[in-house]
Amino acid sequence: LWLWPYLFFIEAVPIRKVQDDTKTLIKTIVTRINDISHTQSVSSKQRVTGLDFIPGLHPVLSLSKMDQTLAIYQQILTSLPSRNVIQISNDLENLRDLLHLLASSKSCPLPQARGLETLASLGGVLEASLLLHRGGSPEQAAGVS
């Protein structure tokens, strides 16, 4: 109860700041993934060149689908033996928090997706990602005819 007076003085974070922080964090994650792939002799076919579910690149995907995809990737990262991926996993958690903040700002709060529950849909996410990399349309990747 003693916190209530302080809560009235807290200003809302401008949505533009949240969007900018989201973009910066995405760039940081991609850079960290690329750094790992350079230091651990990963094949160029396996290298990450970007994240297809970034808002703005493929507006067909919903915020909840993006959150689900991030939860899947986070689950995969936490199961890898490398210590280098711990920070990336933490970054993904922060990115998911920003995504939830963006959704709340649009009055559509997201349910918390859980990695283990969403891991079953990994095949669909990977297929959509591969289709987009091969030049398919976002509609095809989303399964819309």
UniProtKB/Swiss-Prot annotation:
- InterPro entries, from UniProt? 4_helix_cytokine-like_core, Leptin
Q: Which GO molecular function annotation, any one, does this entry have? A: hormone activity
Q: Name one GO biological process term.
A: regulation of natural killer cell activation
SUPFAM superfamilies assigned: 4-helical cytokines
Signal peptide range in chain numbering: 1-12
Provide the protein's localization: Secreted
Sorted keywords for this record are: Obesity, Secreted, Signal
Q: Name one GO cellular component term.
A: extracellular space
The reply to whether Signal figures as a keyword in the UniProt entry is: yes
Its family remark reads: Belongs to the leptin family.
Q: What does this protein do?
A: Key player in the regulation of energy balance and body weight control. Once released into the circulation, has central and peripheral effects by binding LEPR, found in many tissues, which results in the activation of several major signaling pathways. In the hypothalamus, acts as an appetite-regulating factor that induces a decrease in food intake and an increase in energy consumption by inducing anorexinogenic factors and suppressing orexigenic neuropeptides, also regulates bone mass and secretion of hypothalamo-pituitary-adrenal hormones.
The identity of this protein, by name, is Leptin
